[in-house]
């Protein structure tokens, strides 16, 4: 039942995304003030994704092996903590987590940017909704975390023992907070560029998102390094493995971007570099998500 609710919530969330796009385009063209219906629908979108994610967690906790994702990545004897963290210890669950953070961050962006230019807020929302809709469709069509198995197995295959570690259990959510933060920076930069809105005021506004993303990405990489040190036996915290490097690249781009944002906040220069680095950070974050 939890899986069924989760799947339908995912579909309702996609439908709400299309409604948000419709009202956003209408508001962008015709009105001088921000339409509060857009914020309400964005909140509703977030709620549907929360329900969907909770549905997957409940399926893991209850060892619902009619769910293919649960069957492939859980077992009745696994401790409760790892049943919960097993939710994102797989491709489908991790993408659903991505989507959850995406919808949370765009909601926070709208709540925290009320003093910004209306068209800038709406255009940022539209760019972000394109990404969100892409994740909805990808999850529903190709990486459905709620796929059904029949006949229902009595037991699951279990979670990879390497993943049954406290550091790695919290590593993906923290890393994804950094990754997804780069999407807000990306959408906001495209919006500001399109509207010729890049300024010192804008730099001060977006600096918070850059800082937040950098902090989470740094913590995520640090936790992954600690785990690799004692779990994989590489003999060090960093082995220049492709899995490590793929998270390092957006971190380097984000670190550079942060310095350019600090300069832009004081003087209107290096705008081209800010645009290039914003796009690069998000692109590298997407590569890091789908490559690992």
Describe the role of every protein-language-model region.
Residues 1-292:
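Polytopic transmembrane helical bundles with strong interfacial aromatic enrichment
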